[in-house]
Amino acid sequence: STLMRSSAASDVYKRQTDAAQSAAELDAILERGSVNIYMFHGGTNFCFMNGANDYDKLTPDVTSYDYDSPLSEDGQITPKYEAFRNVIARHAPIPEVSFRTDIRQAAYGALCCDGVCSLFDALDVLSTAHSSREPRSMERFGQGYGYILYRTMLPTAMEVSSIELTKAADRAQIFIDGVPALTLYDRELSGAHAVKWSLPQGAQLDILVENLGRVNYSQKMMQQRKGIDGAVLLDGQALQNWQIWTLPLESGALKQIGFSPLSACRQPAFYHFALDVQQKGDTFLDLSGWGKGCVFLNGFNLGRFWNVGPQQRLYIPAPLLKDGVNDLVVFETEGFSANTVCFHDKPELRL
């Protein structure tokens, strides 16, 4: 029979283990049977494919799936690999394998932003607005991943004491006339929230909702619609007549964004960088000082970042780079931009 020792995918970085200890455990298992090493090579959850777990609250996975595996995220042989190989060799013949891949790493240093564009200014080049009496989830528009923006104008002036979003997931940022007013995440989206807003007639209400990753097991799989699939209630009154922009942020749409000279922006925004590469190598993009969002290199979605950690740097394999100027676009949603990024030759996790 096959014995299997594994761990859940959540809290990956809390499950790092000593190579010698892991090798001893592997040896004990092989004394009695077979083993399935999960993960042997974790790799990277590029794009919006990180997924999530649910333990009475949403726990999205980060972009890196390194998992403290025998092979690192960027394909490096680790001490754990060597220790495992030595153990397995005591139980079964292992052929000699010559590793020919030369993994070149590069630290391109700091880079300054050369242009910015507010999401609200880019909506109509990123997507075509849908008109709907009620809010609808992104799946109802054929959208699988990314963000979705809901907009309505208040028909009358209101003194608002509570707001409630029903059937909403995963993270909603609420703006009044372009100014951030409230952010609700996961369980905060259940029930009404006290506010104190004096809203004039015609005030513009925007709600940007992010799909942080779908749960891929258990009964929760049937509850994975993202966006708002119910109603937006102000003091119990449902708002109607919405304009809805689906924002999967695919490469073709990103190319249409027009950037302006850098200026302070408290709204969700796109920041452009030009990286000149003379010699390609694997590199790690550090986003210290930034808030939350995702990054695109030459139109390819490198994944998500969030200043809550633990991941501090995004892995960029050398084949994603091109000789000469590379276009890097950071989409940041919190209004926290450092205006610089830095490329290192090593990853960094802060546990």
Regions found by a protein language model. Give the residues of each.
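Single conserved hydrophobic/aromatic residue that forms the stacking wall/gate
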Residues: S1-A9, Y13
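Extracellular glycoside hydrolase catalytic/binding regions
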Residues: S10-L26
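Aromatic-lined ligand-binding clefts that engage carbohydrates, nucleic acids, or primary amines
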Residues: V160-I176, L275-N298, F305-W306, L328-F331
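Short beta-strands within extracellular/lumenal beta-sheet-rich domains
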Residues: G144-M153, R266-D276
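Carbohydrate-binding surfaces of carbohydrate-active enzymes
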Residues: S10, A28-G33, I37-I244, L249-P261, ...
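Extracellular Ig-like/FN3 beta-sandwich strand-entry sites
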Residues: P200-Q204, K280, D323-V325
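Terminal leader/tail segments of proteins
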Residues: F284, L314-L351
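Short strand-edge motifs at loop-to-beta-strand transitions and within beta-strands
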Residues: T152, G191-V195, Y271-F273, P310-L314
